From Swiss-Prot:
The gene is glmM. This is Phosphoglucosamine mutase. It comes from Helicobacter pylori (strain J99 / ATCC 700824). The modification Phosphoserine is found at S99. Its EC number is 5.4.2.10. One of its GO terms (molecular function) is phosphomannomutase activity.
Length: 445
C-alpha cells in the first residue's frame, strides 16, 4: 500500500490519520532515521489545526518508544522546521500540516538532517518498514533506553533572526505599508514580528487561529479579502500565506493578485541583477506559462522544467546547481536561505525588489504578459489510469493539433483532477476546457 503522496502523508484526521496509523508511521520513520542517526533527536512542529495535538502525541509516543528523544516546538511554518532541523542538529524534522487543505485534514512531512524533504526512494523505504510487522514489534525499547520528549517555546527567535538575515542589510521596510494575511495558520506569530522589526507599517488579518479556521476563506487560496484590505488601507503590498506558510500569494498596490509566473520571472531577473544567482538557470514546473520561458530567455536566463511539487523543484535546482526556482502556485525557493518553499523569505525578497526598483508594485511586478491559461480542479470519485479512459488519446491528439498546451494529472493529495490548458486564442481555450470538463465528469465523477 502506498502511503506517501506528492507532499508527505495527508488525509482526513481520524479517518486515514488515526492515532494507530500515525504511531505506526512514526515508528517506521524513526527506524529509518535511526540507520543514519547522529544525535538521536527529532524535531516536531505543526500548524494550527485542532487535530495537530492528536497527531503530535501519537508521533511522540511512537518515536520515544523506539528510543528517540523528541523536541516539540509548537506552531511554526514548514520552512522553519526545515531550517531548525539542520540548525539544531537533529536527525530529522517532522511537520504536522495539511498545508492549504481544510482544517479537517492533516498531514505529516518529513525532513532529513539537512532540512531537505525526503526523496521518493526514502519514502519507499519507510513504507517497507511500515508493512514489516516483525520489525515494528521488535523495536520497542525498555527501561533507560526509552526516549524522552521536551517542549521548547523560544526557538521562534532563531527562525526570526534567520529571516531577517535573508533581507538585504542596506535596506529597511520603513517606506512600505504592508498587509499580511496569515490564514489563521502557522505564520500568525512569526510574520508580523519580522515585518514590524524591519520597519514596515503592518496591518495583519486572519491571525486568530482557533483550531478550526485555518485557510477558511482566507490566506493564499482566498486572497480576495487581502486585495480589499490593500486597497482600503492604501498599502504598497499585500502578502497571503497558506496554512503552513510555505506558499505566498502577492497583491500589488492596486489590489491585483500577482501571477506566480510573473513573480518567478521578475524575482529571477532581480537575483541576477544582484549577481545572486549561482547559475544562469531558473527552475519551474511543467505548469509554468510559456511567456515565462520567453521572458527569461530575453534576459539571458534559461528555464529548467521539473515535475510538479516543491520537492521536485528543489531536487532539480540541486541537479542544475541553481539557487532559485519555484511553482506558479506560490512555492518559491531561495536555496541560499531555505531548503523548501518559504513564503516569508519570498515576501521579504519581493519587498526588497519593490524598494530597489523605486516603482509602485503594480509596475515593478508586472514584467511581461502571459499567454491565456485555464486551470480547473475537478472533484472526482475515482482515479483510474488516464490512458485507460475511452477517447482520452484522441482528445490529446486534437489538443496537439490545435496547438493547445495541456497538462492533465491527478492531485497527489486530494480526490481531484487538475486540468491546465494554454493557448494563444482565449475563446478556443475556454471552449476546449468545457469539453474536457464534460469528458472527465462523465468518466470519473
Amino acid at each position: 500500500m502506498k502511503i506517501f503522496g506528492t507532499d508527505g502523508v495527508r488525509g482526513k484526521a481520524g479517518v486515514k490519520l488515526t492515532p494507530m496509523f500515525v504511531m505506526r508511521l512514526g515508528i517506521a520513520a524513526g527506524l529509518y532515521f535511526k540507520k543514519h542517526s547522529q544525535t538521536n533527536k527529532i524535531l516536531i512542529g505543526k500548524d494550527t489545526r485542532k487535530s495537530g495535538y492528536m497527531v503530535e502525541n501519537a508521533l511522540v509516543s511512537a518515536l520515544t518508544s523506539i528510543g528517540y528523544n523528541v523536541i516539540q516546538i509548537g506552531p511554526m511554518p514548514t520552512p522553519a522546521i526545515a531550517f531548525l532541523t539542520e540548525d539544531m542538529r537533529c536527525d530529522a524534522g517532522i511537520m504536522i500540516s495539511a498545508s492549504h487543505n481544510p482544517f479537517e485534514d492533516n498531514g505529516i512531512k518529513f525532513f532529513n538532517s539537512y532540512g531537505y524533504k525526503l526523496k521518493e526512494e526514502e519514502e519507499r523505504a519507510i513504507e517497507e518498514i511500515f508493512h514489516d510487522e516483525e520489525l515494528l514489534h521488535s523495536s520497542y525499547k525498555v527501561g533507560e533506553s526509552v526516549g524522552s520528549a521536551k517542549r521548547i517555546d523560544d526557538v521562534i527567535g532563531r527562525y526570526i533572526a534567520h529571516l531577517k538575515h535573508s533581507f538585504p542589510k542596506h535596506l529597511n521596510l520603513q517606506k512600505l505599508r504592508i498587509v499580511l494575511d496569515t490564514a489563521n495558520g502557522a505564520a500568525y506569530k512569526v510574520a508580523p514580528v519580522v515585518f514590524s522589526e524591519l520597519g514596515a507599517d503592518v496591518l495583519v488579518i486572519n491571525d486568530e487561529p482557533n483550531g478550526c479556521n485555518i485557510n477558511e476563506q482566507c490566506g493564499a487560496l482566498h486572497p480576495n479579502q487581502l486585495s480589499q484590505e490593500v486597497k482600503k488601507y492604501r498599502a504598497d503590498l499585500g502578502f497571503a500565506f497558506d496554512g503552513d506558510a510555505d506558499r505566498l500569494v502577492v497583491v500589488d498596490n492596486l489590489g491585483n493578485i500577482v501571477h506566480g509566473d510573473k513573480l518567478l520571472g521578475v524575482l529571477g531577473v532581480y537575483q541576477k541583477s544582484k549577481n545572486a544567482l549561482s547559475s544562469q538557470a531558473v527552475v519551474a514546473t511543467s505548469m509554468s506559462n510559456l511567456a515565462l520561458k520567453e521572458y527569461l530567455k530575453s534576459q539571458d536566463l534559461e528555464l529548467k522544467h521539473c515535475a510538479i511539487g516543491d520537492k521536485f523543484v528543489s531536487e532539480c535546482m540541486r541537479l542544475n546547481k541553481a539557487n532559485f526556482g519555484g511553482e506558479q502556485s506560490g512555492h518559491i525557493i531561495f536555496s541560499d536561505y531555505a531548503k523548501t518553499g518559504d513564503g516569508l523569505v519570498c515576501a521579504l525578497q519581493v519587498s526588497a525588489l519593490v524598494l530597489e526598483s523605486k516603482l509602485v508594485s503594480s509596475i515593478a511586478l508586472n514584467p511581461f504578459e502571459l499567454y491565456p491559461q485555464s486551470l480547473v480542479n475537478l472533484n472526482i470519485q475515482k482515479k483510474p489510469p488516464l490512458e485507460s479512459l475511452k477517447g482520452y488519446s484522441a482528445l490529446l491528439k486534437e489538443l496537439d493539433q490545435l496547438e493547445i498546451r495541456h497538462l492533465i494529472r491527478y492531485s497527489g493529495t486530494e480526490n481531484k483532477l487538475r486540468i491546465l490548458l494554454e493557448a494563444k486564442d482565449e475563446k478556443l481555450l475556454e471552449s476546449k476546457m468545457q469539453e474536457l470538463k464534460e469528458f472527465f465528469e462523465g468518466q470519473l465523477c
